[in-house]
Amino acid sequence: MTDTSSGFDELRTLIARHGTATPVAIGEAAVISRVEETGPPAFSTTGTVFVLMAQGEKRLAVGELVHVYGAEQSMIASVDLPITGHFTRASRREPALGFALTLRPALVAELLLHPAAGRLPRLSRGAPAPGITVGDPSVELVDAVLRMVRLIERPDDLAVLAPLVEREILWLLVRGPLGTAVRQLGLAESTVNRVGHAVQWIRDRYAEPLSIEELAEVAMMSPSAFHRSFQAVTAMSPIQFQKQLRLQEARVRLLADPRDVAGAAHAVGYESASQFSREYRRRFGASPLQDVAGLRQGAGAR
């Protein structure tokens, strides 16, 4: 067993050697990356994922809530959330070095069926775990991640050993201090999973009018309980969540065709172009045309 500092030292060496700005896969569910510039905030979605930052720092904004995780910290996203994120510490001399593992609910559920899971603390009946949590990894967790990353230099062993180490990482997450979020991901009837179904429903229909009653039915909850739970998990109301998706999709459309602001607004569900422009400016700090012009100019400079 390595101690935390030496484990991170080797992890940094391996990721610096093999990582690139485009994530490099290790088996089916894990990736490493090396990012050498901070860059502007960019929209993406989290997926359900465990991230271990070996070096650097990243800032994620989920609605009005901001999460920052840095060197030797971990982040868990138990719901696929829309975020605006960017690295705040990354350079050619000291790149951001990270490991990420997709959290697969079926594997988490399988671990929760093991007799050893019966000794885990019972989940609280209070508010659900937030969709994003940040914390410090244990020595055992860093060691397991290190053994996963070492497999990139052992291609003959990768297919056999990567699934075993993945299970170990998941188990350590389940029984660790941030385990509530991961355990809820594996329980079909958990609040996090129910909210996750509603999140996907909104994603698939973001341009349509939103009905809290219909969303509550999707989540199999009362409207009042659903609204509280959605806010607790996503840090946004359902309306705010939908607005985030609409504005980001409109931004993508305007980058492709900046001449048709009204068309982009209508395509993502806005009936009023003026309301769209007001909310766009509030979200991105500039009018649609000014924002897109700045993005295009920045892309051209790079």
Regions found by a protein language model. Give the residues of each.
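Short alpha-helical segment immediately N-terminal to, or the first helix within
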Residues: 201-205, 252-256
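Amphipathic alpha-helical segments enriched in hydrophobic/aromatic residues interleaved with Lys/Arg
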Residues: 2-7, 108-172, 180, 198-200
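Generic C-terminal helix-cap and adjacent flexible tail
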Residues: 293-302
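Residue at a beta-strand N-cap/secondary-structure junction
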Residues: 59, 209, 258-259
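Basic/polar phosphate-binding segments, predominantly the helix-turn-helix DNA-binding elements
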Residues: 168, 172-178, 185-187, 191, ...
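A short, N-terminal "cap"/entry segment at the start of jelly-roll beta-barrel domains
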Residues: 1-26, 31-33, 39-40, 125-130, ...
